[in-house]
From Swiss-Prot:
It comes from Rattus norvegicus. Interacts with PSEN1 and PSEN2. Binds OPA1. One of its GO terms (molecular function) is serine-type endopeptidase activity. The gene is Parl. It holds the Pfam family Rhomboid. This is Presenilin-associated rhomboid-like protein, mitochondrial. Residues 51-95, 187-214, 264-268, 315-331 are mitochondrial matrix.
Length: 377
């Protein structure tokens, strides 16, 4: 989820954030915060904002305690704590200008690319239909060479719905980024580009990249489970190409809403996770099918309508944003949910059904192309 994480300026005991089982984030001690930056940590012997005695001839500093009680030095590959502290701009409103234009530009490019992708998909389906007839004839006259494993993989893949096939790529991207977090030498890069924070020097690219970023395995698993569960419904409603455009745009838009809230309240801090985009998917499905029945994974006996679930989620995130709850990035959740509701209600008619001019231009480019000698057709 797009959740508050790690180090805040002027950190004290209980001012740092890290993953909490259940998909959320909780307050951790100073010692635990350093573990996120690549330092060794022992859960049984953790310190709670305490100082260890300074070693001889070494400047006093905070240190973690290993299982043997010795202090471990910070690796040279991991940035010192001071380099990960974020300093807000003295002009907070100006900070939002670049993210705003990036959000508008990226959203436009996402839907434009999706329209062209759909056009190319339709053309390729026609061609693949005739190629399939030829391939079936060739397969019937020559022996099969596929192994059992390949047959099982093909059988599993063909059993998936269009939505499940689509989100498989998204899940794979999230898993790859999760693995990168496990490499200590990449922590500096991951914090800079895969966590979104309006106080960071890099503002725009993390708005997209942080949508695929999870530090906690449980956090990623919970998000991907929800995405997988709603994938068939959302792709049936929007189609594969439109869904991808909505999902990517939702990640950027929800992060921009988070930026606005952080700047307005002065509560800066890095966020990461796919929750903003997933909230858009959930809100879109619940708005389109409000009478659908939903259940909690561990409490399948208790069911409720999709419409009521959406209202409860919006109410909780609104309260969390107003009251300053810090377990989740409630502003990003709320921004994603409102975007999903708006898109199903108005955005589909306003954006997707007006894509024809762009598709016609692309068709002309593909059909005519540049002519030699500058002649026209």
């Amino acid at each position: 989820m797009a959740l508050y994480s790690w180090v805040q300026r002027g950190w004290r005991c209980g001012q740092t954030w890290a993953p909490l089982l259940g998909g959320g984030y909780r307050e951790l001690s100073a010692t635990q915060a350093r573990q996120l930056l690549g330092r060794r940590f022992n859960l049984l012997l953790q310190q709670k904002c305490g100082f260890r005695k300074a070693p001889r001839k070494v400047e006093p500093r905070r240190s973690d305690t290993g299982s043997s009680g010795e202090a471990y030095k910070r690796s040279a590959l991991i940035p010192p704590l001071e380099e990960t502290v974020f300093y807000p701009s003295p002009y907070p409103v100006r900070t939002l200008l670049k993210p705003f234009f990036f959000t508008v530009g990226f959203t436009g490019c996402a839907f434009g690319s999706a329209a062209i992708w759909q056009y190319e998909s339709l053309k390729s389906r026609v061609q693949s239909y005739f190629d399939g007839i030829k391939a079936d004839w060739l397969d019937s006259i020559r022996p099969q060479k596929e192994g059992n494993l390949r047959k099982e993989i093909n059988k599993w893949w063909n059993s998936l719905s269009d939505g499940q096939r689509t989100v498989t790529g998204i899940i794979a991207a999230n898993a790859l980024v999760f693995c990168l977090w496990r490499v200590p030498s990449l922590h500096r890069t991951m914090i800079r580009y895969f966590t979104s924070n309006p106080a960071s020097k890099v503002l725009c690219s993390p708005m997209l990249l942080s949508t695929f970023s999870h530090f906690s395995l449980f956090h990623m698993a919970a998000n991907m489970y929800v995405l997988w569960s709603f994938s068939t419904s959302i792709v049936n409603i929007l189609g594969q190409e439109q869904f991808v455009a909505v999902y990517l745009s939702a990640g950027v838009i929800s992060n921009f809403v988070s930026y606005v809230c952080k700047v307005a309240t002065g509560r800066y801090g890095p966020s990461l996770g796919a929750s903003g985009a997933i909230m858009t998917v959930l809100a879109a499905v619940c708005t389109k099918i409000p009478e659908g029945r939903l259940a909690i994974i561990f409490l399948p006996v208790f069911t409720f309508t999709a419409g009521n679930a959406l209202k409860a989620i919006i109410a909780m995130d609104t309260a969390g944003m107003i009251l300053g709850w810090k377990f989740f990035d409630h502003a990003a959740h709320l921004g994603g949910a409102l975007f999903g509701i708006w898109y199903i209600t108005y955005g589909h008619e306003l954006i997707w059904k007006n894509r024809e001019p762009l598709v016609k231009i692309w068709h002309e480019i593909r059909t005519n192309g540049p002519k030699k000698g500058g002649g026209s057709k």
